[in-house]
Each structure stands twice: as structure tokens, then as C-alpha cells.
């Protein structure tokens, strides 16, 4: 479990709270929940006051933060982010990108992001352009 995945459409379980959605991969693996780590992630994502809310009570940006929290909870070496800002407004998109950059720096995680947004792609250390299944330039 060294890869955390962040989906474009969040893929949150609608009947689970923010906290329960973040803990889902840990509980599915029957691992012990690290409550301190959970609280640190909620603070990192600025979701401490929303941890008992259901996904439908959150904005799109907050839902994407929950998806990021779920990925961070498993201590991945790599985070694969598939269009993480695709469904967000520009303010929320900026916030999500800043969180991913912060995760890269603070948690030493490699972020692999798929995006069609050139402005977001330009923020990366390295860009791979894939066209028709082939890498065209790097």
C-alpha cells in the first residue's frame, strides 16, 4: 500500500462521515487507527470542524480534501492524482494544488498528477505529455 489515489470525482462513501471516509482504507486493511495521525491530517486539511459531516454537507473543495486525507492516511510513497481539480472552481483548485505541494514537501511524497490544465501542469517539477498512449515530450 505505497500508492494513494485521489480521484477526480472524490469517490467518497455518501453514508460515511469525513472521519470515516478518511479512515476507510485503514479499516478495510484491519489496521489499528492512529487517532493522532487522523487529527494531524484533519488539521493539515483544515477539516477539524467538519469531521462528523457527511459528503453531501461539504463543498466540492472540501470533498476533494477528504479524498486527499484518505490517500495520506496510508502513508503512501506515491500519490496518484487523477484530475484532482477537474470538478472544482478556480479558488478550490488553487487550494487543492497547494495542499498537494505541501504534502510533497512535508510528507516527502511523490505526486503524479494527470491534468488537462496547462497552468496546473506548469507547477510540476517534470511534465510528461502523453498523446494517443505515447509519451511525446518531457
Question: Where does each model-flagged region fall?
Answer:
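A short, proline-enriched helix->beta-strand linker immediately N-terminal to the Walker B motif
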Residues: 73-77
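Conserved catalytic loops of ABC-family nucleotide-binding domains
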Residues: 2, 102-113, 121
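Short coil-to-helix segment of the ABC ATPase nucleotide-binding domain corresponding to the Q-loop/switch region
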Residues: 16-23
